């Protein structure tokens, strides 16, 4: 189940119940991945992971290995991008970010959705550049 209530304790409540052996709880909130894993989630269905698969995978694996301080440091560095991605709704933010990263050819969306505002695109681009520097040092 994708748990995106915003309450990591919800994962603990679910996993404390008698569940089928193949039942898995996944975080559905990028910004709360670490606390969800601490509360029994076994992974994440991520938005930001589409733009930063290596960084977000590393964060997730650290949390799953119990290396919470290291995972929290990465989560903190990703706070701004996680916030910005949802300021104009999903998938507006991630589409704009992927376009800025030149990973997709267009940031157009189907109506009634519209592309990200120029203000959000500028903030995403600034944040992206800082996060790219952080990731390059982390994986150097």
Feature annotation, model-predicted:
Residues 1-37, 42:
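Ligand/cofactor pocket segment of small-molecule handling proteins
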């Amino acid at each position: 189940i994708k748990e995106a209530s915003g309450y990591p304790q919800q994962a603990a409540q679910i996993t404390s119940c008698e569940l089928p052996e193949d039942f898995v709880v996944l975080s559905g909130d990028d910004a709360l991945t670490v606390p969800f894993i601490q509360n029994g989630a076994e992974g994440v269905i991520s938005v930001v992971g589409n733009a930063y698969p290596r960084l977000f995978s590393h964060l997730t694996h650290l949390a799953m290995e119990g290396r919470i301080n290291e995972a929290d440091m990465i989560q903190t560095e990703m706070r701004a991008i996680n916030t910005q991605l949802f300021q104009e709704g999903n998938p507006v933010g991630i589409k704009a970010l992927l376009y800025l990263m030149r990973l997709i050819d267009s940031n157009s969306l189907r109506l009634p959705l519209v592309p990200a505002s120029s203000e959000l695109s500028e903030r995403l681009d600034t944040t992206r550049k800082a996060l790219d520097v952080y990731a390059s040092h982390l994986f150097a």
